[in-house]
Amino acid sequence: MRFLSLPIVLVAVLAASCATVVNPVTGESERTVMDEAAEVAEGKKAHPGVVAEYGAYNNPRVQNYVNELGQRLARQSHRANLQWTFTVLDSPEINAFALPGGYVYVTRGIMAYLDSEADLAGVIGHEIGHVTARHGAQRATRAQTAGIGVLAASVLGAVLGVGNVAGQVAQSAAAGYVASYSRDQELQADQLGAEYLARNRYNPSNMVDVIGVL
């Protein structure tokens, strides 16, 4: 993404002292610079920029289908309380990502690439897993000492993932410093995606089919 404005609320949150929250997935307490309210605020502020950059795919039937599928998965997740938003972006890139607070995106490119609804559910479940496990907030907390400007870029890089999008954010946000999710976070998102598939009567082995795509 060439430009994604950073909400003022994120800067304020990053400048504040850490709070303690309970991770919804692990049940363990963790120190964080982003509580749930801050996650939701960040996602809400960033969402219009994502849609403005890519454009929403102009097919209401497809949008409704993906939203209904995503909502079913989210209702069986560890953070069913969030107001989840699922959007198909008008991009040929094979990509999917999520912002803190329950904003999940898949491109028309990845939808064309996948073979089945179960595979699409696996992709969406993986991204839901990043949100439910608070991976963006964890990355922000670990990077706190890097400075607010660099940290802001790392948060966006973490939630948007590697590849062209992250590279473009890096160029505009903080001198090329953008970090992706860690291997452990990706593995946890895979495991959560498989769990959410099983909870919705899909074969969890479909996660194996989509791991290479993600």
Q: What does each of the following model-derived ranges do?
A:
Residues 3-8, 18-214:
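A Zn2+-metalloprotease active-site environment signal
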